[in-house]
Amino acid sequence: MVSWAHEAPTPGSRGAGRTKDMAIIGIVAVDRNGAIGKRGQLPWHYSADLKFFKGQTTGNACVMGYKTWLTLKRPLPNRLNVVLTRREGVEARESVVWLRDRESVLSLKDYLKCDLYVIGGAQVFRVFLGEIERWVVTEVPLAVEGADTFMPAGFLEGFRAEDTRRLEDDLKVTFYARAV
């Protein structure tokens, strides 16, 4: 069983057992036009990118919107699944936390001993734009016809590329950090 949480801090302890601050990282795959979805689904399938996503996010927390949650067949394994929703009566599940707003997610900072990956969808990316410290962006070599969900314009403004890695011949991922 993966443990994501520190012991609850006591008054004055400032996060008992913390070894590092939680980083908030956006992770996304985008086509040439910034598309991330079509009819509520990821409009491509690249095994190398899915494997990369799993490697990056395993052992961490992943925050997603309810629509993204619905596209999953089950909770992402070995990750704390944080689902943003205002819906009532959602089913309790192991390794899934249901939260209602951005502030509730940010309050996890005092308790998590892992990073928080913002994994989508578009509304959730918009909500956390000001909080994301780093981006991990897979560039999909397509222009998806009929795409209906896009990344917010300028989401990488104020960030600089630090590293690029090839996942496949035509698929690359770029790591961005907030410019200081």
Where are these regions (language model features)?
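Enzymes that bind and transform nitrogen-containing heteroaromatic metabolites
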Residues: R18-V180
